[in-house]
């Protein structure tokens, strides 16, 4: 199935809509969604770009999703649920931690899928784990992906790597030319914070200015409210180094492509791991050579010496040498610029980013993750085979998992209707401890649907602790309030086990048409059977019947009187059945 065949209503939620890499990528995606016939809804705390959305057909709601106050979060969850219902949202897509908490809980309560995009590195705080709540988690670089895997245990099968993309139509490429001029313009673009390395960049300019006294430097971006003092410190450093005639603090600037058109070189001086570095690919697209520090996701973007120059962080001298090398060497500059443009066209273009994001959206809504719980005896699991078959027929593209007891594992191991078997061994450890260990494992799968065919307290509790938005089962009073889709026992009468299961599947729109039971023995099973028959001098053609005496100590209905077994064996013997 292609993404063009599905019309989706997508809600993206992020803290604010000011000028920055996250905001730019989010808005670019929303604009393309609208252009392709989808509905794009955005929720944020407002910002300088908020009022530009309407002209692109993007719906925006302002909520305090940037605030960490518990009262604010609860309020935003309530309001977001209303927005999800009103706009008929198919997917909620969060791009930061507090929005992930709000979006994750709201989508869970609304029974719709939730995904996240990790745009940076997160401290190992409990709230940071909200970024792993998505059915799929998009990471913007290999570096961020490794961080989410190592620090938060995010399973690889739920991770999707999608490079950020630049709009090649917006950033016009300038063919490199031989430069015979005295004034060169160097730019540094980004928020003014200590981690961005402005201090080391400014120190490198002192050395550059001794060789090129007429350089012009544009520091684009502003300091957040809690870093205003740091910005003043940088201005003081510029004055002390007598670079005030060279360096201009431009402030926040919305049209980055206009800034790029003025630059001869872009510098990224980050001292901490950079998640990606959108400004690098914007320079690539514009024909502006780049010198950057070799940290984090920058290594995923720049191939040193081919499409950019990498230098160690916090090393002003090496940075100055790299700046001078690029500006004074036309051959090197030409080569860097041309290769960088190819990199942007092939790897970091907006069209590819949008297409791959839409594929994740499509997979999110079309490939359901379904868990069936049947942790009882072997016979009961065999009787669930018609339910497995019916689910596969109803959801051919779904990933269907089954939770069974240890002894029942082999019964469904080769079942073609099931993608994965998960074992719940109640005897392995203490019951309560084991229960919550299994629950933690199950929650990592991010199931869309849980179907509880076991129908007891443990299975109801496991259903709830999976954190699946939709949970189906019987309303039997045994913790069944933990299920949000229930069938009542009253009025069902005496029915066989398969019909019993069909009542639960029925509220999911699944009809069991084939009640037949089937097993899938392996080659090793047949080999074992042949060996056993040979030892007993029994041919394969000989009809055999196995009888399980006293199959259940718990259920009196499964225990025949002795005379019934005598009658049965006599009848079988008359037909030469052993």
Spans of model-derived segments:
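Conserved donor-binding/catalytic core segment of Leloir-type glycosyltransferases
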Residues: 11, 179-196, 202-205, 218, ...
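A conserved mid-protein helix/loop that constitutes part of the nucleotide-sugar donor-binding site
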Residues: 23-28, 193-210, 217, 229-232, ...
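Short hydrophobic beta-strand element within catalytic cores of glycosyltransferases
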Residues: 42, 289-292, 302
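A conserved, positively charged/aromatic
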Residues: 108-142, 146, 152-154, 482-489
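Catalytic machinery of carbohydrate-active enzymes
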Residues: 184, 365-578
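Active-site donor-binding acidic/aromatic loop of nucleotide-activated sugar
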Residues: 226-231, 244-253, 259, 309-310
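Conserved acidic donor-binding segment of nucleotide-sugar-dependent glycosyltransferases
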Residues: 304-305, 309-316, 325-331
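A short, well-ordered alpha-helix in the C-terminal region of glycosyltransferases
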Residues: 318, 325, 332-346, 356
């Amino acid at each position: 199935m292609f993404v063009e065949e599905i019309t989706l209503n997508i809600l993206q939620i992020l803290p604010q809509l000011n000028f920055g890499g996250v905001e730019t990528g989010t808005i670019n995606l929303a604009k393309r969604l609208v252009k392709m016939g989808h509905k794009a809804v955005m929720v944020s705390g407002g910002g300088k770009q908020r009022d530009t959305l309407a002209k692109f057909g993007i719906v925006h709601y302002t909520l305090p999703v940037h605030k960490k106050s518990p009262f604010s979060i609860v309020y935003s969850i309530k309001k977001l649920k209303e927005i999800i219902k009103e706009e008929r949202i198919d997917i909620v897509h969060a791009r930061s931690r507090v929005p992930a908490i709000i979006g994750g809980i709201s989508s869970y309560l609304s029974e719709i899928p939730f995904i996240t995009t990790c745009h940076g590195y997160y401290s190992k705080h409990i709230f940071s784990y909200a970024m792993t709540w998505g059915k799929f988690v998009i990471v913007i670089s290999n570096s961020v992906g490794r961080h989410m895997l190592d620090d938060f245990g995010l399973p690889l099968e739920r991770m999707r790597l999608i490079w950020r993309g630049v709009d090649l139509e917006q950033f016009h490429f300038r063919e490199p030319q031989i430069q015979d001029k005295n004034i060169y313009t160097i730019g540094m673009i980004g928020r003014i914070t200590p981690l961005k390395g402005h201090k080391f960049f400014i120190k490198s300019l002192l050395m550059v200015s001794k060789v090129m006294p007429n350089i012009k430097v544009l520091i684009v971006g502003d300091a957040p409210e809690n870093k205003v003092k740091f910005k003043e410190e940088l201005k003081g450093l510029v004055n002390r180094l007598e670079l005030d005639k060279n360096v201009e603090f431009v402030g926040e600037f919305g049209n980055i492509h206009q800034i790029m058109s003025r630059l001869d070189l872009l510098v990224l001086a980050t001292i901490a791991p950079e998640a990606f570095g959108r400004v690098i690919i914007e320079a690539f697209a514009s024909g502006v050579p780049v010198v950057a520090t070799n940290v984090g996701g920058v290594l995923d973007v720049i191939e040193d010496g081919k499409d950019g120059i990498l230098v160690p962080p916090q090393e002003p001298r090496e940075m100055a040498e790299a700046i001078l090398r690029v500006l004074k060497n036309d051959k090197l500059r030409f080569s860097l610029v041309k290769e960088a443009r190819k990199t942007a066209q092939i790897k970091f273009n907006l069209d590819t980013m949008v297409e791959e994001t839409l594929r994740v959206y499509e997979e999110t809504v079309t490939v359901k993750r379904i868990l069936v719980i049947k942790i009882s005896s072997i016979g009961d699991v065999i009787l669930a085979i018609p339910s497995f078959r019916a689910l596969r027929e109803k959801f051919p593209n779904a990933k269907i998992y089954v939770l069974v007891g240890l002894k029942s594992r082999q019964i469904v191991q080769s079942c073609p209707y099931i993608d994965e078997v998960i074992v719940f061994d109640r005897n392995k450890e203490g019951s309560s401890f084991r229960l919550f260990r299994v629950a933690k494992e199950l929650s990592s799968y991010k199931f869309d649907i849980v179907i509880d065919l076991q129908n007891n307290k443990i299975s109801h509790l496991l259903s709830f602790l999976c954190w699946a938005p939709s949970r189906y089962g019987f309303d039997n009073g045994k913790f069944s309030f933990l299920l949000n889709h229930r069938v009542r026992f009253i009025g069902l009468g005496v029915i066989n086990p398969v019909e019993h299961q069909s009542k639960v599947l029925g509220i999911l729109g699944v009809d069991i048409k084939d009640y037949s039971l089937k097993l899938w023995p392996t080659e090793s099973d047949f080999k074992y059977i042949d060996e056993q028959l040979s030892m007993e001098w029994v041919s394969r053609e000989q009809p055999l019947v196995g009888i399980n005496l006293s199959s259940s100590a718990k259920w009196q209905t499964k225990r025949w009187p002795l005379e019934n077994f005598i009658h049965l064996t006599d009848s079988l013997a008359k037909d030469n059945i052993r």
